[in-house]
Swiss-Prot record:
Residues modified to Phosphoserine: S694, S697
The keyword Transmembrane appears for this protein: yes
Membrane topology per record: Single-pass type I membrane protein
Disordered: annotated segments: 653-702
Transmembrane segments: 546-568
Chief place of localization: membrane
Annotated Gene Ontology cellular component terms: adherens junction; apical plasma membrane; cytoplasmic vesicle; extracellular region; membrane raft; plasma membrane
The protein's name in its UniProt record: Delta-like protein 1
Cytoplasmic side, ranges: 569-723
Gene name of this polypeptide: DLL1
GO BP term, example: somite specification
Length: 723
């Protein structure tokens, strides 16, 4: 379980390291020369046009950005930018580290948080300032010189030197890109940090590869290397140098099986076997069968054969002889080596050590010299002081005599199916379509030419690309617009027509709008009516707002005319009505009272909203001084009070009620001539002149009450109506 967790963490660490790469671009300003002390516009740095001396207080603006075929000095500086303080006047040199001015560090460092692309564009501007505190770079009049270049740069510790000359100025500088600690590879994208713990036991190579510590192996160096010779199947180890045996095996290397218990003269190929040795038999191999097996008389690996009881023969191996093969044969006995060569006896063979000047199996050949021209294919021959010679082979050949041609393609250096061509002293990879580079290991960016049109997103493949189109476009390159009528934008049975990059709806009769979503009013036929459908079909232009507005205005005019006719008819009917009592003739009432009645000292009192509650229960309004308590008295004893608004001017009961009301509600002191004429009382007088016996009572809430209560004179029920 622990090893699995360690492996998972190591894999996660490797994935994260592939995403977060780290390195730094370093630019070292070494020397700047302004020969005449002039600005780029040939003016004196102090602003005048006169002759020198002109002292140019020089500072630099550095802009590092991505590779551009035509370098633009304008921002943004995608990789970083820096502005130095004033570093000198006219011509000066810059030491490493920036010198005494702590505000400037030389070299200038631009850290990278992503893989180094290998190319960059660099802009270095030398500018003049009158004050060390004014380091603005936007004024072109301050420019002394400008360097704008693009370069290819590989990762490494070595500095790339460069010199920029612009006629009057020279700038000497150097640059490099180095990886941060624990980062390796061509783009500083390989992360490797040495460790020696439960998660790995390794160091890092030059390219960031993991180099396992002694005794460890595996992708993350988490697997211990067991004791050399330890059987891989039958042994294991928890730490380097161990060899622990599995069940059924034994020995230092766990390569010996454990025999069946009780086996005496037997062996095993698998645990718990008992395979009898020659000359022995039985279940436990404890029964003697022959002499050869028991006594092993034959020596030096000879084969013993039982020829009878107690007898045997030995079959000797080459190089041995004797009854039991105990004697070795001396192959050097006939002295096979010639020309003074020394012989060495071997098993069933011999070898000759030749003196200087001779060679061959038995030293029978004399050595050649450079005079014999032994070197082939243009090799250069050199005589050895002890005799013989040596050949120095040209490029593309090897061997003692330069007789072998080197095949540079034998190691298969080309990747991705590329064909290797041997050029004699080098090789060339012919890449398949979609790949480039020396070894054809770079996938060509098919999206570099921006093949996707109309804002489509390009995804690179192998010799191919794909486009993710924005809404409204389709096709391999997003160049084909989606049919505008595809989603049926026209409503109410309209017909959709495509007109370039838009659509036009041919509306059915009676509908209008860009999508025929409006129902048009039916207008009388005439020359002023415009057929919107024909207009849309003929012109294919925008929505005919003029025609729609004209139709709406015409309908409004018709409605206004009808309203005017109704008003005139009502006015004419009112003129022909006979004169009537103002109160009887007024049909509009509020709180069940005519406007004129609300200002009289009326015989009906309105109870305020806070004094009465709408209910269908009977209430006693006839106690002692009930009229005074409740503040109201019946006005129309014999009239249906729900029909107050329907009373006519010629109703006799209404006239009697009015006369009775006038009699009862007249204030004291009024003359008989004023009988039947409504009298208006002020709010204060009404409250002061209230009489208990009068049966009339006024209320301050008379005019603006939402509930009007009418009581029968001899009935306990209360009728309430709400206006």
């Amino acid at each position: 379980m622990g090893s699995r967790c360690a492996l998972a963490l190591a894999v996660l660490s490797a994935l994260l390291c592939q995403v977060w790469s780290s390195g730094v671009f370093e630019l070292k300003l070494q020397e700047f020369v302004n020969k005449k002390g002039l600005l780029g516009n040939r003016n004196c740095c102090r602003g005048g046009a006169g002759p020198p001396p002109c002292a140019c207080r020089t500072f630099f603006r550095v802009c590092l950005k991505h590779y551009q075929a035509s370098v633009s000095p304008e921002p943004p500086c995608t990789y970083g930018s820096a502005v130095t303080p004033v570093l000198g006047v006219d011509s000066f040199s810059l030491p490493d580290g920036g010198g005494a001015d702590s505000a400037f560090s030389n070299p200038i460092r631009f850290p990278f948080g992503f893989t180094w692309p290998g190319t960059f564009s660099l802009i270095i501007e030398a500018l003049h300032t009158d004050s060390p505190d004014d380091l603005a770079t936007e004024n072109p009049e301050r420019l002394i010189s400008r360097l704008a270049t693009q370069r290819h740069l590989t990762v490494g510790e070595e500095w790339s030197q460069d010199l920029h000359s612009s006629g009057r100025t020279d700038l000497k500088y150097s640059y490099r890109f180095v990886c941060d600690e624990h980062y390796y590879g061509e783009g500083c994208s390989v992360f490797c940090r040495p460790r020696d713990d439960a998660f790995g036991h390794f160091t890092c190579g030059e390219r960031g590869e993991k180099v396992c510590n002694p005794g460890w192996k595996g992708p993350y160096c988490t697997e211990p290397i067991c004791l050399p010779g330890c059987d891989e199947q039958h042994g294991f180890c928890d730490k380097p140098g161990e060899c622990k045996c599995r069940v059924g095996w034994q020995g230092r290397y766990c390569d010996e099986c454990i025999r069946y218990p009780g086996c005496l003269h037997g062996t095993c190929q698998q645990p718990w076997q008992c395979n009898c040795q020659e000359g022995w038999g039985g279940l436990f191999c404890n029964q003697d069968l022959n002499y050869c097996t028991h006594h092993k008389p034959c020596k030096n690996g000879a084969t013993c054969t039982n020829t009878g009881q107690g007898s045997y023969t030995c079959s000797c191996r080459p190089g041995y002889t004797g009854a039991t093969c105990e004697l070795g044969i001396d192959e050097c006995d006939p002295s096979p080596c010639k020309n003074g060569g020394s012989c060495t006896d071997l098993e069933n063979s011999y070898s000759c050590t030749c003196p200087p000047g001779f060679y061959g199996k038995i030293c029978e050949l004399s050595a050649m010299t450079c005079a014999d021209g032994p070197c082939f294919n243009g090799g250069r021959c050199s005589d050895s002081p002890d005799g013989g010679y040596s050949c120095r082979c040209p490029v593309g050949y090897s061997g003692f005599n330069c007789e072998k041609k080197i095949d540079y393609c034998s190691s298969s250096p080309c990747s991705n199916g590329a064909k290797c061509v041997d050029l004699g002293d080098a090789y060339l990879c012919r890449c398949q379509a979609g790949f480039s580079g020396r070894h054809c290991d770079d996938n060509v960016d098919d999206c570099a030419s921006s093949p996707c049109a109309n804002g489509g997103t390009c995804r690179d493949g192998v010799n191919d690309f794909s486009c993710t189109c924005p809404p409204g476009y389709t096709g391999r390159n997003c160049s084909a617009p989606v049919s505008r009528c595809e989603h049926a934008p026209c409503h109410n049975g309209a017909t959709c027509h495509e007109r370039g990059h838009r659509y036009v709806c041919e509306c059915a009769r009676g509908y209008g709008g860009p999508n025929c979503q409006f129902l048009l009013p039916e207008l009388p036929p005439g020359p002023a009516v415009v057929d919107l459908t024909e207009k849309l079909e003929g012109q294919g232009g925008p929505f005919p707002w003029v025609a729609v507005c004209a139709g709406v205005i015409l309908v409004l005019m018709l409605l206004l005319g009808c309203a005017a006719v109704v008003v005139c008819v009502r006015l004419r009917l009112q003129k022909h009505r006979p004169p009537a009592d103002p109160c009887r003739g007024e049909t509009e009432t509020m709180n069940n009272l005519a406007n004129c009645q609300r200002e009289k000292d009326i015989s009906v009192s309105i109870i305020g909203a806070t004094q009465i509650k709408n209910t269908n229960k009977k209430a006693d309004f006839h106690g002692d001084h009930s009229a005074d308590k409740n503040g109201f008295k019946a006005r129309y004893p014999a009239v249906d009070y729900n029909l107050v608004q329907d009373l006519k001017g010629d109703d006799t009961a209404v006239r009697d009620a009015h006369s009775k009301r006038d009699t009862k509600c007249q204030p004291q002191g009024s003359s008989g001539e004023e009988k039947g004429t409504p009298t208006t009382l002020r709010g204060g007088e009404a409250s002061e002149r209230k009489r208990p016996d009068s049966g009339c009572s006024t209320s301050k809430d008379t005019k603006y009450q939402s509930v009007y209560v009418i009581s029968e004179e001899k009935d306990e029920c209360v009728i309430a109506t709400e206006v």
